[in-house]
Amino acid sequence: KTENICMKKALDWSRLVNQSMAMVSDTKKPPFEGTEDALRLAREYADIVILTAANRQEINKEWEVFELAQYTDLLMSQETGRKEECLKTLLEKGYERDHVLMVGDAPGDLAAAQGTGVLFYPILAYQERESWEKFSKALECFTEGRYAGVYQEERIKEFQENLHIEGK
């Protein structure tokens, strides 16, 4: 609870976004082509955690409708905390930093990965299908311990160029 008018407006806006997402038909927001194949493959080698800033109820519904939930072990959503906090929680449970690969499509995803020292694989805007198709190569590098370093740096550079953002 807060008396801060800005915080109240932000909370109201967040609730409206969640309500509007619930009104969009699930058939109108299918996963990108290649997503299921990538999850199925990754599931053979790793625990899969959905880490999203979205509403837990909506994500659960979407992932069930498209039968993606079967490939996941845990859902961490806006109700769980910010992405960086969620990654820290996973690390506290015993995951090693170089054994965590965050897959994301937003600058905040990269920032959360970098802020916690975990690895990052980008899904490029307007190249989502291609990004998911290339994921098998990234997963191979990841499972063989070759992801960190040059391979990851190249992926991050592609991501930053795709979004026209400056690298740090």
Question: What positions do the PLM features span?
Answer:
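Conserved phosphate-coupling serine/threonine residues in phosphotransfer and NTP-handling enzymes
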Residues: 52
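C-terminal cap/substrate-recognition subdomain and adjoining C-terminal extension
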Residues: 27-47, 55-168
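Short, mixed-charge, low-aromatic patches
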Residues: 12-20, 39-48
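A metal-dependent, Asp-based hydrolase signature
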Residues: 1-25
